[in-house]
Amino acid sequence: MLNETNFLYEENAKLIGNRYDIPEEVLHHIKNVLNKFGDQKTVKGYKRANHLLNNPNQPFVNLVMIKSYFDNVDKDNVNPVEYELNGGEVMNKWVQELIKNERIRVN
């Protein structure tokens, strides 16, 4: 496990200064979710959703945190509004694929 952790750290270090534009389809999904659940300002993910809409060009480190959310969330027990405010499956698929491809690219 230590070698794998070191390997991921080295890959991430090569990408740390990069920024990425969130695709329109992901932003559109987040905007729709905010419109639908705009009254739920205390739900985890609300601030992130607003931040992503206002700042669609995100540093790699923020995308890693989003990936970590999806990697660790218990889909069977998560508040569905929270999950959607974090981007839902649209964001999950995009961020997983982006980070995987970027890590391959820098190897």
Tell me what each language-model feature is:
Residues L2-N107:
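Extended terminal accessory/targeting regions
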